[in-house]
Amino acid sequence: MDGVEIIAKSIKNSAIEKVFGIVGVPITPIAYELQAQGVGFFGFRNEQSCSYAASIVGYLTGLPGLCMTVSGPGVVHALAGVLNAQSNGWPMILLSSSIDQSLVGKGGFQECKQFESAELYCKKCYYLTEIDHFPEILKDAIETSLSNRPGPVYIQIPADLIKSKCKESPNIREAAGYGTIAIKSVVPDMKLIKDAVQLLSEAKRPLVIGGKGAAYCRSENELLEFIEATKIPFLPSPMGKGLLRDDHPLVVGAARSYALKNADVVLVLGARLNWMFNFGKAPTFSTDVKFIIVDVDENQASKTKNPNVVPEIAIVGDARLSIAEMRKLFIGETDEQPQPPQDSLIKSMKMEESWWSNLNQDIQVKTKSLATLMSEPQNNDQEYLTYHKVFNALRVGGLFQEDTIFVNEGANTMDIGRLCIPQTLPRSRLDAGTLATMGVGVGYSVAAQICFPDRSVVCIQGDSAFGFSAMEMEVAVRYKLPIVFIVLNNNGVYEGLESMSDPKYTSSTESASLHIPPTSLSVDTKYELIMQSFGGTGYSISTISNLLDICKQIKSKQISLPTLLNIKIKPTGTKPKIVH
């Protein structure tokens, strides 16, 4: 067997069904052999977007996505997705070629310190020295990527090994199953679980925050049972939305600011008290708030290592297992007594009635305020659309189904979209995440549609965010992915210009560089033509009536997908009225 066949067979035997990558010397034969082995290969136009796609696969499926690149620049480009996977805690495998072993340090083709670069962001890096070791390295890489706090790993294969030969060995034939590797969940300390339940039961204004870590470990069923048993208010992080339906009566997303500021005990479940939560500090939180942190990351669930807060109780453990045990303690359920007793801890909870009444009052005010913004009419066809008007039309037009995967990226586009589009299922709202990475949207959408071919995928981006990966429209068309891409086009980053007719913008390159605002992009760019040029469908939209008509055609399958809707919105003065 040659190296190409060994690599492809090992990947196939380990049950990896799809690989994302960009071919080149010397990995092109591997891509062909993967296809011959029945493994789907999805070729992208840039390793950055390709690696973003591989990074989100781990979150969506619970199993690492595999990104394959050439050496040197290919690896460097793909490190964007590796860093994204590391910061979000998602499993991922980056597999790349490198210079022949005999040529290291001699200035060979695309030689660079790629291994050292990958070490900065990966849980573990592997440098292959014998091709017949690849199957066992792949097995270890998968296990490492999935275990404890998930994250990316890197496998580097010198070009001479890819071209080498060896006899087929048992470890090649018997590569451990990708989908069958048993990864043990991190079991929480039951004493700490009991302490957490006691503290929550004594709280007057308790709150549960659920993050994408809780979503990753599939804790939604256990979390729902816990929240409904205790009646403790639940607040999702941006990508924790859908753990409980946004319209569940115990979800307080609309009263986010009030809930955070007034809670006295907060159970943080698979979320980090980072910049999204003002690092757990005032004025976002009360100065005397007590935190219970549950996380598989020992640095987060620690009284000494957490960089932002000293939690009252720190539990290193799987969110699903932890919340299930907490519910049992609250209701008094045991293996010997599966039916809850009459004197369960639920009845002795000290949660104030005013806590819920005040939250509900704030929810009503904020919900009404948001509804007012969204329901503002477009008075005439010449009036600019706004973010809220567009999101309202998309909802009214029925573009979002119960199981739609909503990819949302941009600045204003993402912030307002989080509020305007309700979520009903976990892991179904994908955004810029912990790292606030711009450029992830198209790669995420492609990966989501590949992973879930029977679900609709809607990607809504600002025009700036779309620009990072616009060429990947060709990938969506090539693989016949029925994604709806929507670009909210305000001619800029945050805001743009309504016109560039002023001579100071057009008279010369020097004048343009001195006068065009740094936030401005070209005016009225026809992004829909990008999709059309590849054979997809695209539309320029500037009115609500036109948008509703297009939504109707998409729903009735009168429009072939993928499609891109280039929606023109007000370029200036659109500082969003974020409602929390």
From Swiss-Prot:
Q: What is this protein called?
A: 2-hydroxyacyl-CoA lyase 1
The function of this protein is:
Peroxisomal 2-OH acyl-CoA lyase involved in the cleavage (C1 removal) reaction in the fatty acid alpha-oxydation in a thiamine pyrophosphate (TPP)-dependent manner. Involved in the degradation of 3-methyl-branched fatty acids and the shortening of 2-hydroxy long-chain fatty acids.
Q: How the cofactor binds, per note?
A: Binds 1 Mg(2+) ion per subunit. Binds 1 thiamine pyrophosphate per subunit.
The EC code for this enzyme is 4.1.2.63
Q: How does it assemble?
A: Homotetramer.
Q: Name one GO biological process term.
A: protein targeting to peroxisome
Report if keyword Magnesium is assigned.
yes
Give GO MF terms, alphabetically.
2-hydroxyacyl-CoA lyase activity; carbon-carbon lyase activity; magnesium ion binding; thiamine pyrophosphate binding
Residues that coordinate or bind Mg(2+): D463, N490
> Which keywords has UniProt assigned to this entry?
Fatty acid metabolism, Lipid metabolism, Lyase, Magnesium, Metal-binding, Peroxisome, Thiamine pyrophosphate
So which domain of life are we looking at?
A: Eukaryota
Which is a Gene Ontology cellular component entry for this protein?
peroxisome
Q: Which gene encodes it?
A: hacl1
Give the organism the record lists.
Dictyostelium discoideum
Q: Is the keyword Metal-binding assigned to this protein?
A: yes
Q: Where is this protein found?
A: Peroxisome
| Cofactor(s) recorded in Swiss-Prot or TrEMBL | Mg(2+); thiamine diphosphate
> What family is reported?
Belongs to the TPP enzyme family.
Q: Pfam families from the entry?
A: TPP_enzyme_C (PF02775), TPP_enzyme_M (PF00205), TPP_enzyme_N (PF02776)
| Classification via PANTHER family | 2-HYDROXYACYL-COA LYASE (PTHR43710), 2-HYDROXYACYL-COA LYASE 1 (PTHR43710:SF2)
> Residue ranges of region Thiamine pyrophosphate binding?
413-494
Residues engaged in binding thiamine diphosphate: E47
